[in-house]
Each structure stands twice: as C-alpha cells, then as structure tokens.
C-alpha cells in the first residue's frame, strides 16, 4: 500500500495544491517579454548606471540556478506529492527567470557572450557579493535542522533579491526600459508566490518543538536585512534615482511582513516608502493588450513585497 501511495497521486497538502494551481494560472514565458524597444534605452544610461545594472542582472541570472539547487536539497526532507509538485513548478519558473536575465544581459553587453562570461567571472570576486555569499554560506553550514534551513530559504526568497527588484523598478519611474520593467513585474510577482510558499512550508511542515527561539529568528532577520542593505549600498550610491535609505526602509518593511507571515511580531515597524517603485506590481493596472501583455496575476495574492 505504501508503495502505491508513493506513486499514485492523492492530495496530501491542500495549501500547496492551491499554490500549484495559482502557478498554473499565471505561467508566462520569455517570449512574452519584448526587449526590442529597450535596445535604444541602453545608450541613455550613463557609465555608472550601466555598470550597476550589468552587475545586478548578472547576479540575478546566476542566483536562479542556486535557488534551484537549494530547492532540490530542501525537497529531500519531505514526502509529499503536493509539495513536490509545487516546487517542480517553481523550479520551472526559476529557469524562465534565468532565460529572461540571459536575454537582458545579451542586450546590455551588445550580444557579446564572451564578455558576459568574463564579467560574470570578475564579479565573483566583488567584495559586496562575497560578503553576501559568506554570510549565507556560513548560516547554511550552521543550520542544524529542517526548521532553520526553511527559514534561511524563506529569507533568500523574500529578502536577498528585493533590493535588486526595487532598483530595477526605478526604470519605470524614468520612463525607460519597458520590456525590463515588464519582466521585473512578472519575476517580482513570482517571488511573492515563492515567499508565501516558503512561509507555508515553515508553518505547516515544522513542529513548534522543532523551531528555533524567537530571539534566534529575530537575530537572523536583522542580519539578513543588514547584509542585503550593505550589498545594495556598496553598489548603488551615485546611480540615478537609487536612494539606499529608502531601500533600507523597504527591506525593513519586507522583513516585518515576512515575520508576520510566520506568526511572529514585526521588529522594525517600518512601512514601504511612499514612492516605492514596486507599488506598481501590486496595484491594478489598465492594460492595453495591443501594446503589451497583461502582467496582473489572475488570482488574489497577499502582497509579499
């Protein structure tokens, strides 16, 4: 009987079944992100801006693969059809994100793939990126149980890309890079769902007795916010419209929201900045379907940003 249950699908987690359905309804593809109109915008970027966004998109492009490696490691600890099905869908979406980032990099580097690879090798030695990776690797090494590993995964999904999304969203404020802005909408919304899934995994698949203390969790969140802030601050000063103090405020507000999603009190009491560019991704937009695809999710999601 157990062997039959292993291979024959039956619903064993309603929450993850619903998340899987949400993913099915909102699947999108790289072909839906037109970048032709963005090509002329590349020359509008000054040298400082271009270097900043080359760095961000190279980091994001490589990070997608790392996320999938983490998912594979995490899944080995669960025996659930619905959890496996959902994360198979998430891994597929991460691959789509990686393809879109590759398309954007090809545009920024004028289709010189050799230069893209060389640049990617160079930034692996960047001090800001190294500090971020050292913190994460150290915490992963120290994680002694399932609950701690899920919390780290939750922070990666919810904190470690958000300052990049914020900075990319500023293109819309400048009125340039419409294709990149659409991609950022899609990807930021996917990450909303992924963060909700990680919180659901923690809330439903760990026992209270297995979870670390609140003090441990708060310390982890404070460290993650500070590491992510230092990362974007090291690269973002002097970039057009990038206000690192607003990004810190947004990181704190995001950390508070994630804490509440796992039934803990907020620690910062911060709200997103009034002019947060990611507000566009959570508001209802009037879409002209002759101009571009609709990036609004069909279902109702709690704003994870």
UniProtKB/Swiss-Prot annotation:
Catalytic reaction(s) noted: a 2'-deoxyribonucleoside 5'-diphosphate + [thioredoxin]-disulfide + H2O = a ribonucleoside 5'-diphosphate + [thioredoxin]-dithiol
Annotated organism of origin: Saimiriine herpesvirus 2 (strain 11) (SaHV-2)
PROSITE patterns hit by this protein: RIBORED_SMALL
Alphabetically ordered keywords of this record: DNA replication, Host membrane, Iron, Membrane, Metal-binding, Oxidoreductase, Transmembrane, Transmembrane helix
Membrane topology type: Single-pass membrane protein
GO cellular component: host cell membrane; membrane
Bilayer-spanning residue ranges: 150-170
A GO molecular function held by the record: metal ion binding
Quaternary organization: Heterotetramer composed of a homodimer of the large subunit (R1) and a homodimer of the small subunit (R2). Larger multisubunit protein complex are also active, composed of (R1)n(R2)n.
Name of protein: Ribonucleoside-diphosphate reductase small subunit
Keyword Repeat: no
Function text: Ribonucleoside-diphosphate reductase holoenzyme provides the precursors necessary for viral DNA synthesis. Allows virus growth in non-dividing cells, as well as reactivation from latency in infected hosts. Catalyzes the biosynthesis of deoxyribonucleotides from the corresponding ribonucleotides.
GO terms for biological process, alphabetical: deoxyribonucleotide biosynthetic process; DNA replication
């Amino acid at each position: 009987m157990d062997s039959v249950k292993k291979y024959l699908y039956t619903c064993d987690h309603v929450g993850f079944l619903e998340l899987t359905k949400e993913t099915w309804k909102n699947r999108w593809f790289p072909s839906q992100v037109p970048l032709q109109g963005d090509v002329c915008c590349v020359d509008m970027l000054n040298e400082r801006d271009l270097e900043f966004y080359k760095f961000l998109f190279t980091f994001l492009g490589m990070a997608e693969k790392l996320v999938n490696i983490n998912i594979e490691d995490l899944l080995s600890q669960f025996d659930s059809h619905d959890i496996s099905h959902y994360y198979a869908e998430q891994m597929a979406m991460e691959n789509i994100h990686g393809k879109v980032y590759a398309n954007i990099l090809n545009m920024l580097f004028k289709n010189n793939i050799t230069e893209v690879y060389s640049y990617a090798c160079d930034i692996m030695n960047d001090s800001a990126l190294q500090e971020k990776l050292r913190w994460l690797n150290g915490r992963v090494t120290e994680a002694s149980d399932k609950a701690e590993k899920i919390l780290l995964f939750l922070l990666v999904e919810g904190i470690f890309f958000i300052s990049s999304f914020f900075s990319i969203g500023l293109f819309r404020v400048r009125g340039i890079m419409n294709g990149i802005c659409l991609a950022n909408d899609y990807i930021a919304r996917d990450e909303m769902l992924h963060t909700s899934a990680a919180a659901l995994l923690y809330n439903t698949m760990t026992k209270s007795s297995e979870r670390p203390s609140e003090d441990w969790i708060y310390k982890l969140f404070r460290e993650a916010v500070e590491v992510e802030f230092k990362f974007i601050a090291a690269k973002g000063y002097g970039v057009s419209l990038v206000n690192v103090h607003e990004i810190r405020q947004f990181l704190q507000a995001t950390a508070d929201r994630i804490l509440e999603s796992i039934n803990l009190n907020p620690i910062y009491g911060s709200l997103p900045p009034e002019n947060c560019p990611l507000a566009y991704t959570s508001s209802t937009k009037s879409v002209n379907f002759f101009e571009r695809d609709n990036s609004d999710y069909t279902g109702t999601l709690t704003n994870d940003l």
